Amino acid sequence: MLLAPGDVIKRSSEELKQRQIQINLVDWTESEGGKEDKTEPKEESKAEGSKDGEGTQSESGQKEEGGKETKDADVDRRIHTAVGSGSSTKGPGERANENADRGDGKVGGGGGDADAGVGATGTNGRRWVVLTEEIARAIESKYGTKIDVYRDEVPAQIIEVERSLQKELGISREGVAEQTERLRDLRRKEKNGTHAKAVERGGRKQRKESHGDAQREGVEEEKTSEEPARIGITIEGVMSQKKLLSMIGGVERKMAPIGARESAVMLVSNSIKDVMRATAYFTAPTGDPHWKEVAREASKKKNILAYTSTGGDAKTEFLRLFDHL
């Protein structure tokens, strides 16, 4: 039996269910009136875990992260910028986003070869990129698709991972903050015209090509209006896994369930009542207000294995324990 902080257990609940490991979680909720924290023990079995665990994880995650996220990370925000172009320009990225909001999941030009697992191609053959290394690693790990990180190149098509998808991918608070900072930098550069020269340089050739295509298709005005978005920077907000996969290609990796018998751990808990029967405990920076006391009691036990986070992603380090125990 392994003890761990409550928030680490919540973030890892899906993987624990796949391994058929039971969870005994003492949760805490803060009332709006500033009342004392309440605890509510919940034991998730194999059958019940798939319903209760996910709902609790989502609700608690929103409370923990909601207070520290800035307006730049709002779920409802959509940014579609064409650097060097007018604000009234409407490019293909906006129409793709509107379709996604209606629930059809269609994104213009967002194909990519799902089987290849190495590409993320957007409109006009350009590749979608993300803003941080952590997001790129999470996408590759979950969907098997390698995706590049934005390196200040122009033009570019950037995926902004929004709040609900951040949780799906297991992005840390530090990763969320890094993405927000890079978005601010992009806006600052756009305002100062940093990319304008590079955009203007490619504009003449693009306009000439677009004009020829428009004559052949009989839609010259539409081609001309879309052209600035193709030569600038487009930032596409993505909330759902379905939309992300339609943009980058790839499929969610379905791991075969790992039976509890393949791991020495049968149960994980953050309850102080389970200290006496615990054989190991894992500690990491946490928002679980009860964990400090649990860890203190666990450390008093003889012959208990103690594991401590090295400062990386606590969820990743926590799950690695099951491969070694």
UniProtKB/Swiss-Prot annotation:
Gene Ontology cellular component annotations, sorted alphabetically: viral inner capsid
Compositionally biased spans, kind Basic and acidic residues: 8-18, 32-54, 61-79, 92-105, 175-229
Domain of life: Viruses
MF-aspect GO terms: ATP binding; hydrolase activity; structural molecule activity
Signal peptide positions on this chain: none
Subunit structure: Homohexamer.
UniProt-recorded name of the protein: Helicase VP6-A
